[in-house]
Amino acid sequence: MVNTMKTKLLCVLLLCGAVFSLPRQETYRQLARGSRAYGDPHATCYKDQGVTYRGTWSTSESGAQCINWNSNLLIRRTYNGRMPEAVKLGLGNHNYCRNPDGASKPWCYVIKARKFTSESCSVPVCSKATCGLRKYKEPQLHSTGGLFTDITSHPWQAAIFAQNRRSSGERFLCGGILISSCWVLTAAHCFQERYPPQHLRVVLGRTYRVKPGKEEQTFEVEKCIVHEEFDDDTYNNDIALLQLKSGSPQCAQESDSVRAICLPEANLQLPDWTECELSGYGKHKSSSPFYSEQLKEGHVRLYPSSRCTSKFLFNKTVTNNMLCAGDTRSGEIYPNVHDACQGDSGGPLVCMNDNHMTLLGIISWGVGCGEKDIPGVYTKVTNYLGWIRDNMRP
């Protein structure tokens, strides 16, 4: 009984990290000051070795919860939250992963097999250096609603499949967008039938919708997170996240056919009429009986907010969480209006920003397909960066 109590007390001290020497307000103030000076407190991944990582990841690679850096049991350790350089190193009254000693990646102290030790964290590596980059191939074949293209031109494109409920096999469900090694962003309305995660499959690196590719990567789904305030009448908050299942912290392997898209900065606002791209395996037009066999791309322009209202969309509800984009070309030279259509839902609307293709929207809804002067409607990604970040945490 005595040993059990000691073990419990040890765990409480290690995990909770009782702090007596600094008032909580001062500790938080120092932490905030250090975060602003030396790194982004909202970061969901680390760059290089992670020395400047100031995010809130707090789980080790083995799944253990990190110990508070201000724990009394760390006082004699080289690195702790009360050392003179603590703020500069990102240490303080928290249990977030850090790299104060220049190790290969962020780490923290944990309890493993009742022993006190340090362990590397499962924080993802930032793909900023390569996100949104591609080997673009100029499309050679035109199609109604867009252009046939190759997956290397849109390596962040995902294809989501669902098991049939009343028969064997599976069916193509929606498009998706790879935003990090283990996470795919998509549209909430794709999951109105409430598929359990084990009935979903994600394919990356595929040019043809149902024909396997040589470099494709296939994953089962660990989690399906639909926005808690998704409105299936108006499609407000039309966003969802899929966590890919893998036996290691790394899921998708980067290649010319598979690469994450860059997420935008929260304050990113591109000029009206900026040309952007969409991609997907959807129908060629509303009356098409089948989805496209090959990936297609479309070229559209961002509409001003004054043109993205119910007035221009047959009195359909348009909220501040939506943006509009459409093909503004017209005349005999451009009889084919580029637009998303059924089956493209959940796919990307991407625009060039700082020499990287960047995700601006998620294909959500529209009035018909390829109708002249009627834009498609997309989920505005900049409004959901906090939601994405919070749900990607372990």
From Swiss-Prot:
Keywords for the protein's UniProt record, in alphabetical order: Disulfide bond, Glycoprotein, Hydrolase, Kringle, Plasminogen activation, Protease, Secreted, Serine protease, Signal
SMART domains assigned: KR, Tryp_SPc
CDD domains in UniProt: KR, Tryp_SPc
Predominant cellular place of this UniProt entry's protein: secreted
Listed InterPro entries: Kringle (IPR000001), Kringle-like (IPR013806), Kringle_CS (IPR018056), Kringle_sf (IPR038178), Peptidase_S1_PA (IPR009003), Peptidase_S1_PA_chymotrypsin (IPR043504), Peptidase_S1A (IPR001314), Serine_Proteases_S1 (IPR050127)
Glycosylation-annotated residues: N315
Signal peptide positions (record): 1-36
Pfam families documented for this protein: Kringle (PF00051), Trypsin (PF00089)
Family: Belongs to the peptidase S1 family.
Function recorded in the entry: Probably essential to support the feeding habits of this exclusively haematophagous animal. Probable potent thrombolytic agent.
Subunit relationships: Monomer.
Protein name: Salivary plasminogen activator gamma
Organism of derivation: Desmodus rotundus
Lineage: Eukaryota, Metazoa, Chordata, Craniata, Vertebrata
